[in-house]
From Swiss-Prot:
The modification Phosphotyrosine is found at residues 550, 556, 571, 573, 706, 723, 732, 825, 902, 938. Present in an inactive conformation in the absence of bound ligand. KITLG/SCF binding leads to dimerization and activation by autophosphorylation. Changing residue 207 to E: Loss-of-function mutation abolishing ligand binding. This is Mast/stem cell growth factor receptor Kit. Changing residue 794 to N: In W42; loss of kinase activity and impaired internalization after exposure to KITLG/SCF. It is linked to Defects in Kit are the cause of the white-spotting phenotype (W). White-spotting variants induces severe effects on pigmentation, gametogenesis and hematopoiesis. Mice homozygous for W42 die perinatally of macrocytic anemia. Isoform 1 and isoform 2 are detected in bone marrow cells, spermatogonia and spermatocytes, but not in round spermatids, elongating spermatids and spermatozoa. Isoform 3 is detected in round spermatids, elongating spermatids and spermatozoa, but not in spermatogonia and spermatocytes (at protein level). Isoform 1 is widely expressed and detected in fetal liver and bone marrow. Isoform 3 is detected in bone marrow cells enriched in hematopoietic stem cells. One of its GO terms (biological process) is intracellular signal transduction. Glycans are attached at residues 146, 296, 303, 323, 355, 370, 466, 489. Disulfide bonds join 58-98, 137-187, 152-184, 234-293, 431-494. Residues 25-527 are extracellular. Mg(2+) binds at residues 571, 799, 812. Numerous proteins are phosphorylated in response to KIT signaling, but it is not evident to determine which are directly phosphorylated by KIT under in vivo conditions. The lineage of its organism: Eukaryota, Metazoa, Chordata, Craniata, Vertebrata.
Amino acid sequence: MRGARGAWDLLCVLLVLLRGQTATSQPSASPGEPSPPSIHPAQSELIVEAGDTLSLTCIDPDFVRWTFKTYFNEMVENKKNEWIQEKAEATRTGTYTCSNSNGLTSSIYVFVRDPAKLFLVGLPLFGKEDSDALVRCPLTDPQVSNYSLIECDGKSLPTDLTFVPNPKAGITIKNVKRAYHRLCVRCAAQRDGTWLHSDKFTLKVRAAIKAIPVVSVPETSHLLKKGDTFTVVCTIKDVSTSVNSMWLKMNPQPQHIAQVKHNSWHRGDFNYERQETLTISSARVDDSGVFMCYANNTFGSANVTTTLKVVEKGFINISPVKNTTVFVTDGENVDLVVEYEAYPKPEHQQWIYMNRTSANKGKDYVKSDNKSNIRYVNQLRLTRLKGTEGGTYTFLVSNSDASASVTFNVYVNTKPEILTYDRLINGMLQCVAEGFPEPTIDWYFCTGAEQRCTTPVSPVDVQVQNVSVSPFGKLVVQSSIDSSVFRHNGTVECKASNDVGKSSAFFNFAFKGNNKEQIQAHTLFTPLLIGFVVAAGAMGIIVMVLTYKYLQKPMYEVQWKVVEEINGNNYVYIDPTQLPYDHKWEFPRNRLSFGKTLGAGAFGKVVEATAYGLIKSDAAMTVAVKMLKPSAHLTEREALMSELKVLSYLGNHMNIVNLLGACTVGGPTLVITEYCCYGDLLNFLRRKRDSFIFSKQEEQAEAALYKNLLHSTEPSCDSSNEYMDMKPGVSYVVPTKTDKRRSARIDSYIERDVTPAIMEDDELALDLDDLLSFSYQVAKGMAFLASKNCIHRDLAARNILLTHGRITKICDFGLARDIRNDSNYVVKGNARLPVKWMAPESIFSCVYTFESDVWSYGIFLWELFSLGSSPYPGMPVDSKFYKMIKEGFRMVSPEHAPAEMYDVMKTCWDADPLKRPTFKQVVQLIEKQISDSTKHIYSNLANCNPNPENPVVVDHSVRVNSVGSSASSTQPLLVHEDA
């Protein structure tokens, strides 16, 4: 049997040799040149059923060798002429190559068709950004259709993903993008009408390096004492680990420093971070110098330097004070400011008054700031100084190595005050006065009982004596005059004066015989009485004129109105004076330290202040304080109290300026609210016009921490509910380019105990996503007000404030706005009204409703997307303007508004109030325009809002006919005349 088999094989070999000259699948050689071996069967591809015998023969006069390359690139060798595989398996699918001694080869590709195994799957799926990646899923059966790539969960592949199938190798993904990272795919094909799928492949993308590393150090200068430990951490950020870094000392040539500790980690898929920690355990003076942190990748290099200065011992250097001699008028405030450099940091700081007592009295306060690593500022504010409080004020500061001091000489200028003037002693008239600077006493005489004398007394008749001399307090001066110089009945005036002011006293006397006696002036029909009557009459006329003008001028009132009920076409407002006030809001006014004025109007002002112990007993926080001017009348005081009650009634919301406290007893009413560090939105938009970026393209997420923020189910804020300290925030990254910058801002609202931010909000550019976010936030805030039955009546960009994280807050700025000089407010009757922001029913019928607020919101959107332009540009408010509003004139789309947002504006400007959307519906419309990450961030921030309340939401989808008369006290605009 074996002999028969051998003969058969020999016959096959001969047949192959005879046919080899014509077989197109085998390589051929020119006469005289070595020829490649021949393979039987003589074809480029062979299909073998699984379980059958695979038999291949290599024919060549010389030695031959078979090699088989598996689907996962392993090589199997066979040095026989024949390759026989009994019961072939699908894993034997691949390329079989025969080579001879001349190095010439011939190949055949074999498919081992297995009904149970269509795909050969092996090796993980890796790809480099901007290159091709091969999904190794070759087929065991080439006779299938629709060989392609699908997403694991049945979703659509990325729209820009393209691939090329090859049954022998797999499927090649062309031009891999970073966005494909962790994309799960399967190979798929159709056999006999049935879809078959391979195992899962997860694509891991290696980022292409397209930028230099980001290198940073927390401080660019360091000051140490000899023997202290110097530690500086350099942070290097790149897309992958293929970045080199080191510390160098510039001496002046760079010298590599080997004693460096390395730490590294991945903060997300394409965010690799490394820290190089340089430590000098015991610094010497000659260690001073410039240290450079250097990093490079295939794209380029980056570096940052920090300077070290080592001193022998600590020091305190007080900066020269321009003027240590201070003059202040009685009752005024004065700030004593000392700037100094100290290292180590000061351990003791104190103000001393007159070398014996502390200068920090109850009504004064001391403020100390660390301006930089070693620079400090200390300020003593002396409030409402009295004449007796002049003197030396000394600032003492010390640390472990040094001490220093500086002394201020404070002089309080006081108006003269006459102490004694009404006695005639031994024929002498005496006048004693005190004041600073030293008063000058002059004497005047007039006949009769007058209250003003003009005839001076000759100086030779006057004796002047300094009673007391004090270096800082009031100076007392006495002057005497001999009464014998007066020959007639009359009045003597003693007048004391200095640079601050003057005061007078009068001495009336009459002759009786040869003696002079002090007498009382006649009290009936005296010139003085007549003068008083005339003055009183003139004063009465003036008062009447002023009263008339006062009644005609606009009065301060709370813009926000709370609706009590809706009766048919009429809104009935709650009288805010009847709202309750909870004294839990009371805050001690002596714990407020006032700073600069943020805004001022005809009735009052808003002042930046520091509140001590508002949230925690040992914490200071920046707040805004509303207050009236000293000239405020009862109506203004009641209006401010009403505003306080309305704010306390509304409760807390992230997108309104929230009430923090109040001072209503022991002085004028103060309303303490949140401080918004970036001012009003209108001016913010105008500042950002030149840096506006019109883009909505997304980038990949850059930090796992912030992915957790986006996908967490719990709020990512702390639970302390502290009011935000208005200092630079912290920076982090989230999936989109704009969200990345927004998160750097918003994080200061959420995470207050992490790395300081690289950028402040006000340094970042403005883009379309910011405008959409502002639109969304203001709509949310107005929806909250509507849920509390509150109508705003003056919604505009000027009444929206901006704080850290670019969080918008709706406010009523009427108290601190000078509407008399604001062209946005037009005088009608006794009111100044923002006509260009008002709905037609508000202009012509004085109707203020939820729907009129929606109209104003549409105008606000126009302001927003025009980056702070004035609405109806170039159009004055006159009869022509009123006519155009009545006839349905509406503004065209602003330059930067997407079509969808202009559609929202037009729905807000519907002439029929009932057809305008509610704020709840506006929120839903804008939610479709903003990114999911922005919505999620906003949701997290809303959950973090301190002391949240859960108001009962009133559904305003049940609309009423709003065109009715208003209970507002504001007068309606007069119907205009046609142009």
